[in-house]
Amino acid sequence: MENLNHCPLEDIKVNPWKTPQSTARVITLRVEDPNEINNLLSINEIDNPNYILQAIMLANAFQNALVPTSTDFGDALRFSMPKGLEIANTITPMGAVVSYVDQNVTQTNNQVSVMINKVLEVLKTVLGVALSGSVIDQLTAAVTNTFTNLNTQKNEAWIFWGKETANQTNYTYNVLFAIQNAQTGGVMYCVPVGFEIKVSAVKEQVLFFTIQDSASYNVNIQSLKFAQPLVSSSQYPIADLTSAINGTL
Protein backbone atom coordinates (compact mmCIF):
# COMPACT_ATOMS: atom_id res chain seq x y z
CA MET A 1 0.00 0.00 0.00
CA GLU A 2 1.50 3.32 -1.08
CA ASN A 3 1.47 6.44 1.06
CA LEU A 4 2.39 10.00 0.14
CA ASN A 5 5.05 10.38 2.85
CA HIS A 6 6.94 7.16 2.05
CA CYS A 7 6.67 6.05 5.68
CA PRO A 8 6.96 2.32 6.43
CA LEU A 9 3.52 0.75 6.49
CA GLU A 10 4.13 -0.62 9.97
CA ASP A 11 4.60 2.95 11.23
CA ILE A 12 1.35 4.07 9.64
CA LYS A 13 -0.56 1.28 11.36
CA VAL A 14 0.71 2.38 14.75
CA ASN A 15 0.69 6.12 14.14
CA PRO A 16 -0.54 7.27 10.72
CA TRP A 17 0.85 10.78 11.27
CA LYS A 18 4.44 9.72 11.83
CA THR A 19 6.90 11.12 9.31
CA PRO A 20 10.69 10.71 9.18
CA GLN A 21 12.63 13.16 11.37
CA SER A 22 9.44 14.95 12.39
CA THR A 23 9.33 17.14 15.48
CA ALA A 24 5.55 16.88 15.79
CA ARG A 25 4.08 15.61 19.02
CA VAL A 26 0.79 13.73 18.89
CA ILE A 27 -1.51 14.17 21.88
CA THR A 28 -5.01 12.79 22.25
CA LEU A 29 -7.42 14.92 24.24
CA ARG A 30 -10.88 14.19 25.53
CA VAL A 31 -13.99 15.97 24.31
CA GLU A 32 -17.27 16.30 26.11
CA ASP A 33 -20.14 14.26 24.69
CA PRO A 34 -23.55 13.69 26.30
CA ASN A 35 -23.18 9.92 25.92
CA GLU A 36 -19.50 9.14 26.34
CA ILE A 37 -16.00 10.60 26.37
CA ASN A 38 -14.35 10.70 22.96
CA ASN A 39 -10.98 11.83 21.68
CA LEU A 40 -9.90 14.64 19.41
CA LEU A 41 -6.61 14.08 17.63
CA SER A 42 -4.16 16.93 18.21
CA ILE A 43 -0.98 17.22 16.14
CA ASN A 44 1.42 19.72 17.67
CA GLU A 45 4.38 21.22 15.81
CA ILE A 46 6.17 22.95 18.69
CA ASP A 47 9.77 24.13 18.31
CA ASN A 48 10.10 25.20 21.95
CA PRO A 49 8.78 22.63 24.47
CA ASN A 50 8.12 25.49 26.89
CA TYR A 51 4.93 26.13 24.91
CA ILE A 52 3.54 22.58 24.85
CA LEU A 53 1.11 23.35 27.67
CA GLN A 54 -0.25 26.30 25.69
CA ALA A 55 -0.92 23.95 22.77
CA ILE A 56 -2.77 21.56 25.05
CA MET A 57 -4.83 24.36 26.57
CA LEU A 58 -5.87 25.63 23.15
CA ALA A 59 -6.80 22.17 21.95
CA ASN A 60 -8.78 21.65 25.13
CA ALA A 61 -10.73 24.87 24.50
CA PHE A 62 -11.67 23.95 20.94
CA GLN A 63 -12.88 20.50 22.00
CA ASN A 64 -16.14 22.21 22.86
CA ALA A 65 -16.60 23.12 19.19
CA LEU A 66 -17.33 19.51 18.27
CA VAL A 67 -21.07 19.31 17.64
CA PRO A 68 -23.56 16.75 16.27
CA THR A 69 -23.75 16.64 12.50
CA SER A 70 -26.64 16.53 10.04
CA THR A 71 -29.08 13.63 9.89
CA ASP A 72 -26.95 11.88 7.24
CA PHE A 73 -24.30 11.32 9.89
CA GLY A 74 -26.41 10.14 12.81
CA ASP A 75 -24.78 10.85 16.18
CA ALA A 76 -21.38 11.67 14.68
CA LEU A 77 -19.49 14.70 15.97
CA ARG A 78 -17.48 17.13 13.88
CA PHE A 79 -15.65 20.41 14.44
CA SER A 80 -18.02 23.31 13.72
CA MET A 81 -16.40 26.49 12.42
CA PRO A 82 -19.26 28.76 13.64
CA LYS A 83 -19.04 27.19 17.11
CA GLY A 84 -15.27 27.54 16.98
CA LEU A 85 -15.62 31.27 16.29
CA GLU A 86 -17.78 31.59 19.41
CA ILE A 87 -15.25 29.73 21.54
CA ALA A 88 -12.35 31.79 20.16
CA ASN A 89 -13.92 34.89 21.70
CA THR A 90 -13.81 33.31 25.17
CA ILE A 91 -10.21 32.08 25.19
CA THR A 92 -7.70 33.73 27.51
CA PRO A 93 -5.15 35.13 27.03
CA MET A 94 -7.00 36.86 24.22
CA GLY A 95 -6.15 35.89 20.67
CA ALA A 96 -7.65 36.46 17.24
CA VAL A 97 -9.13 34.41 14.42
CA VAL A 98 -6.89 35.08 11.42
CA SER A 99 -8.83 33.08 8.84
CA TYR A 100 -11.62 30.55 8.57
CA VAL A 101 -13.27 28.37 5.96
CA ASP A 102 -16.51 26.48 5.35
CA GLN A 103 -16.10 24.91 1.93
CA ASN A 104 -17.43 21.95 -0.04
CA VAL A 105 -15.07 19.95 -2.22
CA THR A 106 -16.40 17.36 -4.65
CA GLN A 107 -15.22 14.94 -7.28
CA THR A 108 -16.84 12.32 -9.51
CA ASN A 109 -15.21 8.92 -10.01
CA ASN A 110 -11.65 10.14 -9.68
CA GLN A 111 -8.64 8.88 -7.77
CA VAL A 112 -8.54 9.38 -4.02
CA SER A 113 -5.23 11.19 -4.46
CA VAL A 114 -7.04 13.91 -6.42
CA MET A 115 -9.41 14.56 -3.51
CA ILE A 116 -6.48 14.61 -1.10
CA ASN A 117 -4.76 17.30 -3.16
CA LYS A 118 -7.94 19.38 -3.36
CA VAL A 119 -8.34 19.29 0.42
CA LEU A 120 -4.67 20.12 0.94
CA GLU A 121 -5.01 23.26 -1.15
CA VAL A 122 -7.92 24.44 1.00
CA LEU A 123 -6.06 23.83 4.26
CA LYS A 124 -2.79 25.34 3.03
CA THR A 125 -4.71 28.56 2.46
CA VAL A 126 -5.96 28.47 6.06
CA LEU A 127 -2.52 27.70 7.53
CA GLY A 128 -0.74 30.36 5.46
CA VAL A 129 2.73 31.45 6.59
CA ALA A 130 3.00 28.69 9.22
CA LEU A 131 3.82 26.17 6.48
CA SER A 132 7.37 25.09 7.20
CA GLY A 133 8.54 21.84 5.61
CA SER A 134 7.71 19.68 8.62
CA VAL A 135 4.25 21.25 8.97
CA ILE A 136 3.53 20.45 5.33
CA ASP A 137 4.62 16.87 5.98
CA GLN A 138 2.26 16.55 8.94
CA LEU A 139 -0.60 18.21 7.07
CA THR A 140 -0.13 15.93 4.07
CA ALA A 141 0.00 12.84 6.26
CA ALA A 142 -3.10 13.86 8.20
CA VAL A 143 -5.16 14.59 5.09
CA THR A 144 -3.94 11.41 3.38
CA ASN A 145 -5.09 9.39 6.36
CA THR A 146 -8.45 11.14 6.39
CA PHE A 147 -9.20 9.23 3.17
CA THR A 148 -6.91 6.17 3.30
CA ASN A 149 -5.64 3.66 5.87
CA LEU A 150 -9.07 3.88 7.50
CA ASN A 151 -9.13 0.21 8.46
CA THR A 152 -6.28 0.88 10.88
CA GLN A 153 -8.23 3.83 12.34
CA LYS A 154 -11.82 2.57 12.18
CA ASN A 155 -12.18 2.36 15.97
CA GLU A 156 -10.18 5.48 16.80
CA ALA A 157 -12.00 8.32 18.48
CA TRP A 158 -11.23 11.05 15.94
CA ILE A 159 -13.36 9.27 13.32
CA PHE A 160 -17.14 8.90 13.57
CA TRP A 161 -19.10 6.64 11.25
CA GLY A 162 -22.47 7.99 10.12
CA LYS A 163 -25.39 6.42 8.35
CA GLU A 164 -24.75 4.03 5.48
CA THR A 165 -26.76 3.12 2.40
CA ALA A 166 -26.27 0.45 -0.23
CA ASN A 167 -23.90 2.70 -2.18
CA GLN A 168 -22.77 5.47 0.19
CA THR A 169 -20.71 5.76 3.36
CA ASN A 170 -20.76 8.85 5.57
CA TYR A 171 -18.15 9.66 8.21
CA THR A 172 -16.65 12.61 10.05
CA TYR A 173 -13.00 13.17 10.87
CA ASN A 174 -11.57 15.70 13.33
CA VAL A 175 -8.00 16.88 13.72
CA LEU A 176 -6.30 19.89 15.31
CA PHE A 177 -2.91 21.44 14.61
CA ALA A 178 -1.05 23.62 17.10
CA ILE A 179 1.97 25.32 15.53
CA GLN A 180 4.83 27.31 17.06
CA ASN A 181 7.90 27.73 14.91
CA ALA A 182 10.11 30.36 13.28
CA GLN A 183 7.35 31.26 10.83
CA THR A 184 4.75 31.94 13.56
CA GLY A 185 7.03 34.35 15.45
CA GLY A 186 5.62 35.51 18.78
CA VAL A 187 2.29 33.70 18.45
CA MET A 188 0.98 30.15 18.40
CA TYR A 189 -1.45 29.10 15.70
CA CYS A 190 -4.21 26.66 16.55
CA VAL A 191 -6.03 25.15 13.55
CA PRO A 192 -8.93 22.78 14.30
CA VAL A 193 -10.38 21.02 11.26
CA GLY A 194 -13.62 19.09 10.86
CA PHE A 195 -14.54 16.99 7.83
CA GLU A 196 -17.96 15.69 6.81
CA ILE A 197 -17.28 13.08 4.15
CA LYS A 198 -19.78 11.39 1.84
CA VAL A 199 -18.26 8.76 -0.42
CA SER A 200 -20.07 6.68 -3.02
CA ALA A 201 -18.86 3.27 -1.84
CA VAL A 202 -19.75 0.75 0.83
CA LYS A 203 -17.86 0.95 4.12
CA GLU A 204 -15.96 -2.30 3.48
CA GLN A 205 -14.42 -0.67 0.41
CA VAL A 206 -13.81 2.71 2.05
CA LEU A 207 -11.85 1.09 4.88
CA PHE A 208 -9.24 -0.19 2.45
CA PHE A 209 -9.00 2.72 0.01
CA THR A 210 -5.55 3.62 -1.23
CA ILE A 211 -4.57 6.79 -3.07
CA GLN A 212 -4.86 4.91 -6.38
CA ASP A 213 -8.49 3.87 -5.86
CA SER A 214 -11.27 5.89 -7.48
CA ALA A 215 -14.49 7.17 -5.89
CA SER A 216 -16.97 10.03 -5.91
CA TYR A 217 -16.78 12.36 -2.90
CA ASN A 218 -18.67 15.22 -1.36
CA VAL A 219 -16.58 16.71 1.45
CA ASN A 220 -17.40 19.65 3.69
CA ILE A 221 -14.38 21.25 5.37
CA GLN A 222 -14.77 23.58 8.34
CA SER A 223 -11.68 25.12 9.90
CA LEU A 224 -10.22 28.27 11.40
CA LYS A 225 -6.80 29.59 12.32
CA PHE A 226 -6.57 31.11 15.80
CA ALA A 227 -3.48 33.12 16.77
CA GLN A 228 -2.55 33.60 20.43
CA PRO A 229 0.53 35.34 21.87
CA LEU A 230 3.01 32.81 23.22
CA VAL A 231 2.41 31.81 26.83
CA SER A 232 5.17 30.09 28.79
CA SER A 233 4.18 27.01 30.76
CA SER A 234 5.38 28.78 33.90
CA GLN A 235 2.56 31.31 33.50
CA TYR A 236 -0.16 28.68 33.92
CA PRO A 237 -1.43 27.67 37.36
CA ILE A 238 0.23 24.55 38.73
CA ALA A 239 -3.14 22.78 38.63
CA ASP A 240 -3.25 23.18 34.84
CA LEU A 241 0.27 21.78 34.51
CA THR A 242 -0.59 18.79 36.69
CA SER A 243 -3.75 18.12 34.70
CA ALA A 244 -1.83 18.28 31.43
CA ILE A 245 0.79 15.82 32.67
CA ASN A 246 -1.91 13.44 33.91
CA GLY A 247 -3.86 13.74 30.67
CA THR A 248 -6.97 15.07 32.39
CA LEU A 249 -7.23 18.44 30.66
Curated annotation (Swiss-Prot):
GO terms for cellular component: extracellular region. Keywords: Plasmid, Sporulation, Toxin, Virulence. InterPro entries: CytB_endotoxin-like_sf, Endotoxin_CytB. GO terms for biological process: sporulation resulting in formation of a cellular spore. GO terms for molecular function: toxin activity. Pfam families: Bac_thur_toxin. Active after proteolytic processing. Signal peptide: none annotated. Belongs to the cyt1/cyt2 endotoxin family. This is Type-1Aa cytolytic delta-endotoxin.
